[in-house]
Amino acid sequence: MKKIISLIIIYLLVCVQLHAQLIKGKVVDEHNVPMPLVNVALLSESDSTLIKGVVTDKDGVFNIESHNHSNLLRFSFIGYQNFYKTCTENDVGVIKMKEISTELSGVTVKAKRPTIKMSLDKVTVDISNSYLQHLGKVTDILKRIPGLTSNFQLLEGGSPTFVLNGKVTTVQELAAIPSSEIKRIIVDSSPSAEYSASNKGVVYITTKTLLSNTLSSELSNASVFARHYMDMVDLTINERYKKVSNLLTVGYSYIKSTQIDNTTETVYLPQQTIESAKERRTHSKGNIFNCFYSMDWDINKRQSMGFQYTGNVSRTNEHEPTLQTMNGSEMAFSQWKDGNNYMHSTSVNYNNKIDTTRNLSFVADYTFQHSHDTGLADIYPVVKTNSEGRYHIAGARLSYRTQRKWADLSMGVFGSTMSSTGAYLYNTDAEDYKTNETLIGAYFSLSKRFKGFYLQGGLRMETNSRKLETNTSGMFTDSTEWHFFPNLVMKKNLTKNSSIGLSIGQTIARPSFSDLNPGLYYYDAISYSVGNPQLRPCITTNLKVSYQHSNFHVSVVYNKNKNKIIQLPIWTDVSIDNKNIKWIPINFDKSSTIVATAIYHYSLGPIQGDITGSFTKPFVKANYLGNEYSCGKPSWYFSVDGQWALSSYSMFAFDGSYDSGGNSTLFNHEKSWTMNLTYMHRLFKDKFTLLVAFNDVFHTDHGNNWTMKYNNIKTSMHTNGDTRSLIVKLSYNLGKLQLDKNKQTASKELLDRL
């Protein structure tokens, strides 16, 4: 009898286990960034009582066991809207959580979450929870983002693609947006094949969104005291009513600055040595007007549309008194330059969440830019220049994403076209130019996660057609090129808090119009430049190994370049207008670099920040004075920054960096270090925000000092710019206005978190 009972019990247990199913999925935020520690609850469909619960791992993945054919899952995370999903399959795909905000009248609520989150290939910075939101413009923030350098390059080498609210944008457009309207910035150093192969990584930038039926506005003024003066005034209006949100910012800047450049050139000839030195002081004045407008419309739960506009109008004046010496003979002259420029850029986007596993999106944009510059040099004979250009750029991208049991699939098609016309006048020598360029292509990417392992592979195809011509050189470029760019990313979870990864990809750097145009451009009394129509695009193969443990990330990258484009000086025996040094871009067949980087995010009580370091070793050889010259001097870079909440109304921040100098291809840079200090204080119940910043406190930024050697010419540059400055910014928050009588309330869960 006991045996029979035992067999029955075993049979029932086996039946239960056989009937059980394992439900799996992945949770991401609105920017497809994996969300760890999200609560996943299995609820009873009849009365929503809790059956069991789990949390997602650091990659946003969860597994929960169920004995029912139909299941109700609830996803919750503090600061995000609860998400419910009924499922009958084992794989629920990707769950996208939507963030909420809290508005409490008369109460100052301070969040305690960290400002920086790190994963194997991404650095996420919460700008809205950092002093960075008060710095000025988006470009001021980017200079202080871990993983980026002060000139907007990736720390591990290469230029990123900037994406604002899903639209590819430029640094010029980002300079129009106040930092106070930025919510989050993500640096992705190993992106998929979706974005341009001309850039190595992607920087995602997201603006803020208000609660429904709310209007807010802010007025700010920033003054920069350096050798001269700069003043920036910005007005921001952010509004959301029902399903439509609008963001408008207008700004005006007045700039007055001075930069001192000292250039030396030494030419070693068989019979003599020619030494030239030039000191140029550039006194600049400028007036800039910026405008940015963004509109988002939630058509329904699945569909949304958006519109963006960026406008920029500027007028600049430069006066450059110059002293040039060649073999003891001095020549003093001045140059005056006037510039007028305006740019208008618009884009529309549409997003359709077809169902929980499929998404379709479309983006189209158009940009028009016009520039007109005049110049005068009081040398003998007098030189007058006049240049004008008009640029039209249009593009579109259609993307489709779906999550399947066998893999996640992303694919799309894209195209863009650019046309420009213009003219350049040097005294009586005139050159008219016309360019047409078209880029079309497609991409697809597959990704799969299984047993702590992640695999993503993709392929991008681009075809580029160019027609470049001038009235003096005729049609000097008429070409069509096809390129395929493979992409592979592999990740493995070693423990709950650590992972390792490998990524392989390729990028391309195409020569610009000025690189290809054989026409002359005059530098100074002894130098001129020409383009090289024979230039080939540079293809770079990138291999990266990464390791991440909690708040520490380290990577080693090997970049191999084929046909690297470098502009070099060459001595010509036959002079042109008494000028014998010709600068011309050429292709270097082979060059490579190894870059090792490390980022650590720390938190010490009220102080949190990050420590960043990198080591770069180039491998390139050139000819100098008849011998093979190796340019392989390594360089070190180290930076540390932090913010310290002194009280609930004040904060102190610092950031410093050291660059040991070293070779960048053929340019040997000098060492440099900087220190910036920032103090922020809120006044009158957060109505006023005062920010005081000291940039380059010790005036030690020599980042533009370099020496280059090639063939029989040695040239150097020493720049003394307006890097040391005092910034005083005062912002006035005009407050928030409810647009209807329905009060917004924060959930208890959210309040408990803050």
Regions found by a protein language model. Give the residues of each.
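Outer-membrane beta-barrel signature, preferentially recognizing the C-terminal barrel domain
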Residues: 435, 508-562, 581-594, 717-724
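Outer membrane beta-barrel strand-and-loop segments of large Gram-negative receptors
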Residues: 393-397, 441, 536, 542, ...
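Short, acidic Ser/Thr/Gly-rich low-complexity loop/linker segments typical of extracellular
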Residues: 46-61
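N-terminal periplasmic accessory domains that precede
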Residues: 90-96, 106, 110, 138-141, ...
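Face-selective signature of the C-terminal outer-membrane beta-barrel domain
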Residues: 288-316, 335-471, 493, 497, ...
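Outer-membrane beta-barrel translocator/receptor signature
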Residues: 196-203, 211-262, 286-289
